[in-house]
Amino acid sequence: MERYRLPKTAFVRKGWEYDAVYRGGRRLHGVGFTIIYLLNSTENNRLGISVHRKLRGAVKRNRIKRIIRECFRLHRDIFPQKADIVFAVRPGFALSSPEQIRQAVGSLCGTPCGVCNEKA
């Protein structure tokens, strides 16, 4: 059985990479979270997740991160291509089901301006 994993190259890892996305990226605001993205020169898109510690409970924070990673892994085609994408989860975010995050991301990426289909 083959495992479908995201390689380490699929993640924003360094602090300066997050800073670059926060400073120069475009923002899409959802309910309880913001997607910030910045086009890059790599062949694939990369994911970064930022969950505020004011969202109480490490179990909740880790579950949110796990669900966002899984959504990114399964639906990479709805995100901007060749971009660094950071999910900034705000303290008021409440996750009732994994389907909720997929619908929220899908509704943001289905915006009329079509920013999620931009090509580098």
Swiss-Prot record:
Q: State the organism's lineage.
A: Bacteria, Pseudomonadati, Thermodesulfobacteriota, Desulfobulbia, Desulfobulbales
For this protein, the record's HAMAP family field holds: RNase_P
- Reactions mediated catalytically: Endonucleolytic cleavage of RNA, removing 5'-extranucleotides from tRNA precursor
Q: Could you tell me the EC number(s) of this protein?
A: 3.1.26.5
- Name this protein carries in UniProt: Ribonuclease P protein component
Function comment = RNaseP catalyzes the removal of the 5'-leader sequence from pre-tRNA to produce the mature 5'-terminus. It can also cleave other RNA substrates such as 4.5S RNA. The protein component plays an auxiliary but essential role in vivo by binding to the 5'-leader sequence and broadening the substrate specificity of the ribozyme.
Q: Name one Pfam family in it.
A: Ribonuclease_P
**Gene this protein is translated from:** rnpA
Gene3D superfamilies for the chain? 3.30.230.10
Q: Which PROSITE patterns match?
A: RIBONUCLEASE_P
Molecular function via GO: 3'-tRNA processing endoribonuclease activity; ribonuclease P activity; tRNA binding
The UniProt entry's sequence similarity note says: Belongs to the RnpA family.
**Subunit note:** Consists of a catalytic RNA component (M1 or rnpB) and a protein subunit.
Species the sequence originates in = Desulfotalea psychrophila (strain LSv54 / DSM 12343)
Q: Does the keyword RNA-binding apply?
A: yes
Any one of the GO BP annotations:
tRNA 5'-leader removal
